[in-house]
Amino acid sequence: MRNQKGVTVWFTGLSGAGKTTVAREVERQLKEKGYYVQRLDGDIVRQHLTRDLGFTKEDRDENIRRNSFVAKLLTQNDIITLCSFISPYRKARQTAREIIGEFIEVYVNAPLEVCEDRDVKGLYAKARAGEIDNFTGISDPYEPPQNPDLELRTDKETVEESASKVIEYLEEKGYINLPEDVLAG
């Protein structure tokens, strides 16, 4: 039996803030310790599960709703689910929390200029040139979490430091390293 309880760790932040990078490192460390982990990443999911959706507010909300449903199924089966989605709107993140239940909101915080510097795809430049509509942080708002469960400052921390904070939080809240008697009951 695994020493873990299902939970969704929801990484939110601007494009380029480091959501996927930190989630991959958390996934690597947890799997190395034998935990069952599944990572849902915005870029990958949009190629498969939500390819019919665009980037209007309504489509973004629907994207989050669908992914919340998948995360809920995984979480209910005691999988540690790492979700990396910009998820720019507070209300949609609150809806995700309500759908999923066991939910940890992680604000991956980096200043816009840092995110732009990290942008290898040139998306920010295209958005600033008017070539991409509804681009979060440029032509569409990002509503930062008001009370995230955890905040990572990826402009001031290494990837390993950020990942360690997430893993320590999971331990503190009793999602990993559970004693056998808790799991049996």
UniProtKB/Swiss-Prot annotation:
Binding site for ATP: 13-20
Record GO cellular component, one term: cytoplasm
A Pfam family per the record: APS_kinase
UniProt keyword annotation of Aminoacyl-tRNA synthetase present: no
Keyword flag tRNA-binding: no
Role played: Catalyzes the synthesis of activated sulfate.
Family membership: Belongs to the APS kinase family.
Listed name of the protein: Adenylyl-sulfate kinase
Organism per entry: Halothermothrix orenii (strain H 168 / OCM 544 / DSM 9562)
